[in-house]
Amino acid sequence: MIQSLYEPFRHWSETGSIYMLADTHFDDADCKLMDPEWITAEEQLEIITGMVHRNDTFIHLGDVGNGKYIAEIRAKNKILVLGNHDRRSDYAGLFDELYTGPLFISDRILISHEPVCGLTWCLNIHGHDHSRQEAYGDGCKHLNLAANVCGYRPVSLGRLIKNGILSDVDGIHRETIDKAKKIKKIG
C-alpha cells in the first residue's frame, strides 16, 4: 500500500502494485512516423500482460488507440487519464475510472497526459512526448512514460518511490508552508 496517495486513490494500491504507461496508440496507423522502431499492439500487450497482474492497478496516461486491447489486461483497476487522441465515450466501458487530468494523486505526484510545466514542487508523470527528452527546462521533475520512450514497459509507482524518485521533491505542502512563513516574517 502506498500511504502517501490521497484518500480517493488509495484503493489503487490496496491489493497489488500500481503500473503506469502512456501512448500505446494500439493499432494507430501513424505510429511508425513517431518512431520507426514502434512495435505492434500485440507485442505491446504481451509486455503489459506479462507485468500487470490480476490484483494490480493499471493507469494509462492517455492516447490508448484501439480499446479492444484494454480488455485483455487483467488488472483489478484500470484507470485512464484521457489523452489528446482519446474520447471518453470510446473507453467508458473499458476502464473503471476516467479522468480528464491533470490529477494530483499525492502531495508530490501529478499524473497527466501532457507534460505540465512550472510546478517545481512535484514529480509530473506523463506521456504525450514521443521523443526521449528528459528535461523540459522548467525546473520541474518529469517522468515521461510514452510507450516508445520507456520500452513499452509499464512502470511500477511503488518501485519508483522505493528507488527514491521523490527524494528531491519537496511537495506542495512544504512549499506552501515555507512561503507562508516568509510572508509572515516580512509582514
Regions found by a protein language model. Give the residues of each.
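Short, flexible hinge/linker loops that cap or flank conserved catalytic cores
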Residues: H11-W12, E72, C117-G118
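A general structural motif
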Residues: T15, N55, A75-N77, T120-W121
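Short, electropositive alpha-helical surface patch
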Residues: Y69-L82
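Conserved beta-sheet core of the metallophosphoesterase superfamily
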Residues: I79, D86-K184
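Glycine-rich, low-complexity intrinsically disordered segments
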Residues: H60, V81-N84
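N-terminal active-site segment of His-dependent metallophosphoesterases
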Residues: M1-Y69, V149, K162-N163, A180-K182, ...
